[in-house]
Amino acid sequence: SRGLGDVYKRQASIQRALARFKKHHSDLKDLPNKVVFQMNDTHPTVAVAELMRILVDEEHLSWDDAWDITTRCVAYTNHTIMAEALEKWPIEIFQRLLPRVYQIVDEINRRFVMQINERYPGNEDKVRKMAILYDGQVKMANMAIVAGYSVNGVAKLHTEILKNQELHDFYEMFPEKFNNKTNGITQRRFLAHANPLLADWATKKVGAGWITDLTMLSKLKAYADSPVAQQEFAEIKRANKVRLAKYIKEHNGIDVNPDSIFDVQVKSCLLYTSPSPRD
């Protein structure tokens, strides 16, 4: 399955990174100074357990030393507040497919639940919300938060919702981990490379410095009311639509009218990201 294939890829990535590290360094305690595994959403979270497995089983470190290294080597980016987008595995399947990795997860969970009970004695609701293993499921997001030295959202509002609502219990316990990193795009890829006609037009207006200093594009405001600049901009937009229509015809055999409105989503179509109909 795709899910299991993804797990094997994460394991291979961890193994390769450690092999490369050991070529140049002898002390694994130096790993956090050289390597960070950024878990981009919950799908790569098995990296936590795989790194622990290698450090304990293959490098023969104590659990405490391995955990100290791991928790300084992994960080977690949360992309959504929607529960269905946070990966969960049925314990039965996870245990059968990855028996040793599951044992590691089980021990991480056991120790963390002890922490919860020390902090909130007798509060089963906290355990229910925060445990990695609960109600027959492996909750990958919980493992990412427990292990990661950093937990970030991708917009200010998103991060505040995580802290105050969706992940509030974790924020209450680990406030120092939470921070915001606003998502964005790079003008080098999405303008200079992807839209050469518009990139050339911008360079003619404000110079080439915008390629490395995005703030320079604000100088284009001076042309906002210029009929000539507006016409040039419109011509570039239409030329790009004609180019896309030609590509669609050549690759998909579909005729597209370049004078129609193009509503394009460059994104994988998943249940929680599929575009909704426009009015």
For each feature predicted by the language model, list its residue ranges.
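Function-dense linear segments that define catalytic or interfacial modules
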Residues: 1-2, 6-36, 184-221, 236-239
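Conserved small/polar residues in nucleotide/adenosyl-binding loops
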Residues: 3-8, 272-279
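Polar, glycine-rich mid-to-C-terminal structural blocks
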Residues: 106-137
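Core structural elements
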Residues: 38-50, 73-77, 240-252, 266-274
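Structured ligand/cofactor/substrate-binding pocket environments in proteins
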Residues: 1-21, 35-46, 142, 146-161
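Secondary-structure transition/capping motifs at alpha-helix termini
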Residues: 20-32, 55-68, 80, 115, ...
